[in-house]
Amino acid sequence: MPRRREVPKREVLPDPKFGNVDVAKFMNVLMLSGKKSVAERIVYGAFEQIQTKGGKDPLEVFTVALNNVKPVVEVKSRRVGGANYQVPVEVRPSRRMALAMRWLREAAKKRSEKSMALRLAGELSEAAEGRGGAMKKRDEVHRMAEANKAFSHFRF
């Protein structure tokens, strides 16, 4: 553990179009090699697709999708007496958000649509409805935690 003072969390400024901090954070998660303008174009393109195809408010779809994908519990490895146990632990709110965004990004990348904006739009729409790759990942993590409930007394 470092002995110096704790470094404060950086504040993320809201995105210019919607004024939403979560959208800005998601753009940062999506960004590669510091190319924020490309990430913005992808996210806003996906939001336009959601607006035109679904006729729903894209910001609402995004927040519902994010809330659906957020994990409540996950497993962590804990070594006890020469054996590794997968111990279920509750996920803290900041990590919930980070995992949800990461899973949405990865699920969108794996889709087969032509552009990343189309893939992201499809993934966000499906996640908002409780389907899709990101939801599958969340359910898988929850299943792992449920299966290893017996080891929950090995709390960290």
UniProtKB/Swiss-Prot annotation:
One of its GO terms (cellular component) is small ribosomal subunit. One of its GO terms (molecular function) is structural constituent of ribosome. CDD domains: uS7_Bacteria. Keywords: Ribonucleoprotein, Ribosomal protein, RNA-binding, rRNA-binding, tRNA-binding. Pfam families: Ribosomal_S7. It comes from the Bacteria. SUPFAM superfamilies: Ribosomal protein S7. GO terms for biological process: translation. InterPro entries: Ribosomal_uS7 (IPR000235), Ribosomal_uS7_bac/org-type (IPR005717), Ribosomal_uS7_CS (IPR020606), Ribosomal_uS7_dom (IPR023798), Ribosomal_uS7_dom_sf (IPR036823). The keyword Cytoplasm does not apply. Part of the 30S ribosomal subunit. Contacts proteins S9 and S11. Belongs to the universal ribosomal protein uS7 family. One of the primary rRNA binding proteins, it binds directly to 16S rRNA where it nucleates assembly of the head domain of the 30S subunit. Is located at the subunit interface close to the decoding center, probably blocks exit of the E-site tRNA. NCBIfam families: rpsG_bact. This is Small ribosomal subunit protein uS7. It comes from Paraburkholderia phymatum (strain DSM 17167 / CIP 108236 / LMG 21445 / STM815) (Burkholderia phymatum).
